[in-house]
Amino acid sequence: MPITPQEALQRTIEHREIFHDEMVELMRQIMRGEVSDMMVAAILTGLRVKKETIGEIAGAATVMREFSRRVDVADRQHMVDIVGTGGDGSHTFNISTCAMFVAAAGGAKVAKHGNRSVSSKSGSADALEALGAVIELQPEQVASALAHTGIGFMYAPVHHPAMKVVAPVRREMGVRTIFNILGPLTNPAGSPNILMGVFHPDLVGIQARVLQELGAERALVVWGRDGMDELSLGAGTLVGELRDGQVREYEVHPEDFGIAMSASRNLKVADAAQSRAMLLQVLDNVPGPALDIVALNAGAALYVAGVADSIADGVLRARAVIADGSARARLDAYVVYTRQLAVQP
């Protein structure tokens, strides 16, 4: 017998786990709109208070993938997603979006799953729009962009229409729920490799093990000790690495890669225009902490994608494609191509 919403709520109140298969059925009911808003809010609150387990998160992510509009990609070799849970409150420029262009220029295929702003002043979707790209592409258009430019951006509302069912509840609740950590786990292109930033240190090991359960090939899940959901320059970064079916947790520091430490306040922006300006400075090879943090995160993406042998090797490759202009050229090519896609009948 599938678990009922009432039984699920009771479990959370008693701090007992909703098992993986039960969570799958419960999430299907929620995504089909069969559970009342009041009950959805109660269950989400109960899960948050008791703390979601690996099995619960993996079960919920499985259903979100089921209900998504998929991007068909024939060759996933060297494919990577660079994504964060958001919610770290850092208000930095869009580091992961800038790293996307660098990683693509360095030889990775970047299938980035993103949305509008959560923790930064400019989310990945906001940043791409400010750069002139078209973000609301259909799945087949994303596949075409990925094939032609090495970059495919999947705007979450296009690919997860079923999320409209829970959007009003999430908006009214106004607090983090399991859905905040599901987005990065539900890449519509099925990227087998992922660089994921998280907003809490506990999630480093949890999300790495969820990805392991979901069948990912390689992953780096990161949290900076200064609170950033990126590999940080301002402090050490906790890392959960999935490789060869095993999860290993460790800590890295910017000095390990020949990068000077720098406080995150040096990366802060007030709005999308400032974020755009800082991103372009990086791609135009202007030295400073913004370039350093992009090289570090793009280097990690190249490592997890299997292009680089190590993060350090990835950082060198990232700096090279920024310096020779190919990362900036990749941005320009992507903007032009998405505009062409948007006007095609």
Curated annotation (Swiss-Prot):
It comes from the Bacteria. Its cofactor is Mg(2+). Its EC number is 2.4.2.18. Binds 2 magnesium ions per monomer. Mg(2+) 1 binds at residues 96, 230. The keyword Magnesium applies. One of its GO terms (biological process) is L-tryptophan biosynthetic process. It catalyses: N-(5-phospho-beta-D-ribosyl)anthranilate + diphosphate = 5-phospho-alpha-D-ribose 1-diphosphate + anthranilate. This is Anthranilate phosphoribosyltransferase. It comes from Xanthomonas axonopodis pv. citri (strain 306).
